[in-house]
């Protein structure tokens, strides 16, 4: 029997419940995955290994203790600052009785994979760095910095430090998101720092020339960042709102933005717009979502409903100039619609950039009274437009989470319909539900209002010993604790405009090997993994 997408989801759920392997359920290796039946549990001193679908394996391409080929005085390793040194002059990566402290972990974050047929230069003249590269910013420490994993290089040249300061000598902020802007020929990095955050553009050079472009793209708690085929840049914000009185439910406080450049590749002149959602002809706003379980929030998170949208311009360099500005405050003033920490978004492949899917991470607390009604557990939403530059569209709910599927953060398409999403549920929710983070596959064509349809777990993340030590010692006052999953990234590395994510249908784990899958197990040892399908 030929399996439809709905049947694929149902088959996976039924097999998971019965403990039966799911294999050969469709022609693409992305769908030939055995579900991992449950998440790893959490308890003091317990450091379980990660469990992947049996068809998959992961290979560390770098980890926090990988030494940079061109270290600086402040930064010498992929995942550690030089702020606390041991007797041997190296960062204290694991506490000892004699040195019961740790160096600052720098938390490598979102990954961007690129292939350059003629290679790139590095920190060592004459070294062979190959053609395949993985770029990332770092989310913690001081200064912030940018690195490049040279996937084809030897150990001594595996990771290159690109920059710790901008072109004016200012220390870089810590970074979350990243993408490649093919028209500008720049890497773009986002800083999730509220009205001190924004977007920085970096060249491929070593050292990289890095420029703060927040005079056009604004300042905000920016995380997710993607191009579209018209040269617009879509930015998804993560700014946690204040608690609603007397509860652990948090106010929606983060926006989805679209930067429309004067021409593709122009990072200095253009308009920043924010998404506005309307209900019964009235904008859903920061104020309208202030009451507990507000009607607007409930409506947005109800299966089968859809809402008209429009883009409102919050800043135009032609009339407002090029001084950095607070994008979040302007979006509120223009009555744009905030969400519960949307964090990241991607375009559905082969949709002509007419479908944009984004997550809401939610409240990450099992006691939130808005978990079931309002996206407090998590949600996946879909924006549909007639073109990527259209002024209007429609927003609808793809998936509403529950305790076992919560805190969705990063996402990346595995095929036209199958979406990989990963949890960042956080230490509090890990403890409350006795479950660490997982990675799932959602089918964006499935009807998740039917409780028989559930996401397929492809990864039950573990907790490495370093993270377990941090969890038992409060991170030594500086470091994060439980591991989280970040930087899930599926790409063929095409640096041209034809390679913008969403242009082509991904084909990971196929014999051609062009499409590759990466993620980082953030915190603890901070390994960055490539997920592969071993040869049978």
Locate the predicted segments by residue.
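Gram-negative bacterial Sec-dependent N-terminal signal peptides
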Residues: 4-25
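Conserved small-residue
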Residues: 25-536
């Amino acid at each position: 029997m030929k399996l439809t997408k709905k049947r694929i989801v149902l088959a996976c759920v039924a097999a998971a419940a019965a403990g039966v392997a799911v294999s050969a359920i469709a022609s693409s290796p992305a769908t030939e995955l055995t579900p991992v039946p449950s998440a790893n549990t959490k308890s003091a001193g317990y450091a379980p290994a990660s469990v992947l679908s049996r068809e998959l394996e992961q290979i560390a391409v770098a980890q926090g203790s990988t030494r940079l080929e061109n270290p600086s005085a402040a930064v010498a390793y992929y995942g550690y600052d030089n702020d606390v040194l041991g007797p041997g002059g190296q960062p204290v990566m694991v506490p000892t009785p004699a040195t019961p402290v740790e160096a600052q972990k720098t938390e490598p974050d979102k990954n961007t994979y690129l292939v350059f047929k003629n290679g790139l230069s590095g920190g060592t003249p004459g070294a062979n760095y190959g053609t395949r590269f993985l770029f990332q910013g770092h989310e913690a420490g001081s200064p912030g910095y940018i690195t490049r994993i040279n996937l084809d290089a030897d150990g001594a040249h595996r990771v290159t430090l690109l920059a710790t300061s901008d072109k004016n000598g200012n220390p870089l902020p810590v970074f979350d998101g990243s993408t490649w802007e093919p028209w500008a020929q720049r890497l773009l990095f986002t800083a999730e720092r509220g009205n001190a955050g924004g977007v920085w553009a970096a060249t491929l050079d070593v050292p990289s020339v890095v420029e703060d472009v927040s005079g056009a793209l604004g300042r905000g708690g920016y995380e997710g960042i993607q191009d579209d085929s018209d040269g617009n840049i879509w930015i998804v914000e993560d700014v946690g709102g204040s608690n609603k009185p007397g509860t652990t439910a948090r106010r929606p406080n983060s926006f989805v933005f679209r930067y429309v450049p004067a021409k593709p590749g122009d990072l200095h002149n253009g308009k920043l717009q924010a998404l506005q959602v309307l209900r019964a002809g009235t904008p859903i706003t920061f104020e309208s979502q202030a009451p507990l379980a507000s009607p607007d929030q409930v409506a947005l998170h109800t299966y089968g409903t859809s809402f008209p949208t429009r883009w409102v311009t919050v800043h135009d360099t032609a009339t407002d100039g090029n001084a950095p500005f607070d994008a979040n405050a302007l979006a509120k003033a223009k009555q744009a619609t905030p969400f519960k920490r949307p964090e990241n978004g991607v375009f559905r492949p082969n949709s002509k950039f007419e479908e944009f899917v984004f997550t809401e991470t939610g409240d990450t607390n099992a006691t939130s009274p808005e978990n079931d009604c309002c996206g407090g557990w998590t949600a996946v939403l879909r924006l549909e437009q007639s073109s990527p530059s259209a002024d209007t569209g429609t927003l609808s709910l793809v998936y509403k989470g529950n305790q076992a599927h919560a805190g969705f953060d990063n996402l990346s398409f595995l095929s036209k319909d199958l979406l990989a999403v990963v949890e960042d549920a956080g230490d509090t929710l890990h403890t409350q539900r006795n479950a660490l983070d997982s990675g799932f596959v959602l089918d964006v064509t499935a009807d998740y209002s039917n409780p028989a349809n559930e996401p397929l777990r492809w990864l039950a993340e573990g907790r490495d010993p370093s993270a377990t030590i941090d969890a038992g010692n409060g991170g030594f006052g500086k470091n994060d604790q439980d591991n989280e999953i970040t930087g899930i990234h599926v790409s063929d590395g095409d640096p041209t405009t034809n390679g913008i994510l969403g242009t082509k249908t991904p084909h990971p784990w196929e014999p051609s090997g062009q499409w590759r899958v990466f993620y980082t197990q953030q915190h603890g040892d901070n390994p960055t993994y490539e997920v592969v399908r071993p040869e049978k």
